[in-house]
């Protein structure tokens, strides 16, 4: 029997990551089922909560109920935690608790962390993880502070929560929003003319979207692009192409009104994010396909 136990196959890093994500999704779905999670105080069907939790952890932004009007503040907080966990990665979140508690991180845990964030080597993985956590929370905090003037003007004290939620959601590229409290599934249509807010959200999405390893290269080598890793160069070049080309299409074929400045910002915004400044039925069929 002891020999069988010794020969028992250990769970690989990828299995731990997969089971970790599945566990977080299932836990989130169960919590969202509770009456306290919905604004109406009712039990939400499991299929809806499972879809919402999966969408939040996988940061897809797809929803079956309007986030702002259907879920209570508690439910929205659960969704935000799921988004943050999905954006950082389950293993990174778990590792952060170990660091805060002062526990030593084993070699096996370091290897799992390496796989979780696709780091090139195990060496320096703890330092890289700290950089990721500090960078994430700092940028999200700055984003929330910059949004405060807009949302506190429109929502009062609730504007603080609106700022935090949308900063985290944008940085994690989640696509979730709370603007349904004005009109269900309205997204950013009520703020289509607020260029200041559009730019902040767009910059948060781009900053979060390029990835942790690119941050590391930028932080280490600054403007010396030649020293960037091949992965960072590919990510930056591909991101630029995928942002600029669709933006040019939107600019010339969709927006035939407004100033050049407004058209430029709106085109870039629609290229960067799935959040909508216009109702989805308004663009042409060609734009919806692109």
Predicted region positions:
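Membrane-proximal intracellular helices of multi-pass ion channels
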Residues: 1-289
């Amino acid at each position: 029997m002891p020999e069988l136990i010794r020969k028992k196959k250990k769970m690989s890093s990828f299995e731990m990551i997969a089971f970790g994500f599945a566990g977080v999704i299932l836990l989130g779905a169960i919590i969202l089922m509770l009456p306290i999670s919905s604004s109406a105080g009712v039990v939400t069907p499991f299929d809806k909560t499972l879809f919402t939790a999966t969408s939040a952890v996988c940061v897809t932004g797809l929803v079956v109920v309007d986030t702002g009007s259907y879920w209570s503040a508690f439910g929205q907080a659960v969704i935000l935690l799921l988004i943050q966990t999905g954006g950082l990665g389950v293993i990174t979140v778990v590792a952060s608790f170990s660091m805060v508690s002062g526990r030593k991180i084993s070699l096996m845990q370091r290897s799992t962390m390496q796989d979780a964030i696709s780091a090139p080597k195990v060496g320096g993985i703890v330092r890289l993880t700290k950089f990721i956590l500090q960078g994430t929370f700092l940028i999200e905090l700055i984003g929330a502070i910059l949004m405060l003037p807009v949302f506190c003007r429109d929502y009062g004290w609730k504007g603080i929560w609106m700022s935090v939620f949308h900063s985290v959601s944008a940085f994690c590229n989640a696509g979730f929003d709370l603007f349904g409290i004005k009109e269900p599934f309205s997204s950013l249509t009520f703020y289509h003319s607020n260029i200041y807010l559009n730019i902040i959200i767009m910059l948060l999405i781009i900053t979060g979207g390029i990835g942790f390893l690119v941050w590391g290269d930028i932080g280490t080598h600054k403007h010396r692009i030649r020293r960037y890793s091949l992965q960072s160069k590919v990510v930056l070049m591909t991101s630029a192409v995928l942002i600029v080309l669709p933006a040019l299409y939107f600019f010339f074929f969709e927006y035939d009104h407004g100033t050049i400045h407004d058209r430029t910002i709106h085109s870039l915004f629609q290229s960067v994010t799935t959040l909508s400044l216009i109702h989805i039925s308004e663009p042409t069929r060609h734009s919806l396909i692109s």
